[in-house]
């Protein structure tokens, strides 16, 4: 005799079960994604603060040890490259240095921005770096205000939230970016900005 299969022994998930699983995954993503952005911002900003410390320490060595061999205790305003003398990458004024001569590593070279906005070839952890235009070099006998470096994010509130600056006083300063989300940063931290808190 012929029997009909009523489908009662079929296996699989019902539409309700699938919707519940999708809902749970959606809730988990809604909680996790903002935390991932915060972690990314924190990592980029920590890396940039370290870069500011490296520039500060490099400038101090350049000054104290007269690494450009010009007989003057002065700073440099250039990151440069391994063949350009009188820079943080190649302190001796003659140029043609080795990595051992360098005060900063090669990742600084592509991170240099020369305009008003953070636009560089190879950002360092989402940030561009530039020599501060508000440096006061009127008194060559003091350490105060002889150099300054700034860092700003390439995409505001996507790669970071704060801009950074460091001057001859050695204090790393921060300013919360006021740029529109996604716009390049405008190097808003300066010598009047508050010191960064940990």
Predicted regions and their residues:
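Aliphatic-rich helix starts adjacent to a transmembrane/signal segment
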Residues: 35-52
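A short, surface-exposed interaction/processing loop segment used at functional sites
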Residues: 166-189
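Secretory/exported precursors with cleavable N-terminal leaders
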Residues: 12-20
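Alpha-helical hydrophobic helix detector
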Residues: 19-35
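N-terminal leader/signal peptides at the extreme start of proteins
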Residues: 1-13
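Extracellular/periplasmic head regions of type IV pilus-like filament subunits
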Residues: 57-162, 168-169, 176, 194-198
């Amino acid at each position: 005799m012929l029997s009909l299969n009523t489908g009662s022994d079929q296996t699989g998930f019902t539409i309700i079960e699938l919707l519940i699983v999708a809902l749970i995954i959606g809730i988990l993503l809604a909680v996790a994604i903002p935390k991932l952005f915060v972690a990314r911002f924190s990592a980029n900003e920590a890396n940039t603060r370290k870069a500011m410390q490296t520039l500060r320490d490099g400038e101090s060595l350049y000054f104290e040890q007269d690494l450009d061999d010009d007989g003057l205790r002065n700073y440099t305003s250039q990151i440069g490259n391994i063949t350009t003398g009188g820079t943080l990458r190649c302190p001796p004024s003659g140029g043609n240095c080795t990595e051992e001569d360098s005060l900063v590593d090669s990742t600084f070279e592509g991170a240099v921005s020369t305009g008003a906005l953070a636009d560089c070839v190879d950002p360092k952890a989402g940030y561009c770096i530039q020599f501060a235009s508000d440096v006061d070099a009127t008194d060559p006998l003091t350490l105060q205000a002889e150099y300054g470096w700034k860092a700003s994010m390439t995409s505001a509130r996507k790669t970071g939230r704060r801009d950074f600056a460091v001057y001859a006083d050695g204090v790393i300063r921060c300013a919360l970016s006021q740029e529109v989300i996604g716009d390049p940063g405008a190097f808003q931290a300066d010598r009047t900005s508050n010191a960064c808190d940990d």
